[in-house]
Amino acid sequence: TREPEIYGSRGFDSFLDELKAEFPSLELSYFQSNVEGEIINNLHEHGFTADGILLNAGGYTHTSVAIGDAVAAIKTPVIEVHISNVFARESFRHLSYIAPHALGVISGFGLNSYRLALEHFTRK
């Protein structure tokens, strides 16, 4: 696990199983990539049919105009999610190219940031 003091030590796969059990009315799928173009392609693939997207773009949040543009181009509402509180970290992390096009941003609640975002989609 990368930097457990920041991100915790729990793997996402077991957490996803927990979320699927907790939110049975939602059809949850998971995609992870370290490749900017793959993230953009996935947004374009699902961004017109999914009911919602939770996007943790990691470091690309602060550097990728292209991912921000991809979020702007799709119709599906996107919630930007971060495990750590990006505003309590280095100043370069305070900039998001995604947030201006997102429905909202949830940051700093550990893996529970994902749970909080999913709760929004259950209350629509």
Q: Each PLM stretch: what is its role?
A:
Residues 3-22:
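Short catalytic helix/loop segments, enriched in acidic residues and glycine
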Residues 23-29:
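A generic structural motif
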Residues 29-37:
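Short beta->alpha junction loops
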Residues 29-30, 79, 88-124:
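Short, glycine-/small-residue-rich phosphate/pyrophosphate-handling segment
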Residues 38-42:
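Short acidic active-site motifs
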Residues 46-53:
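Short acidic/histidine-rich motifs immediately flanking catalytic phosphotransfer sites
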Residues 58-61, 84-86:
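Short glycine-rich anion-binding loops that position phosphate/pyrophosphate groups of nucleotides
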Residues 64-75:
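Short Gly/Thr/Asp-enriched flexible loops that form oxyanion-binding sites at enzyme active sites
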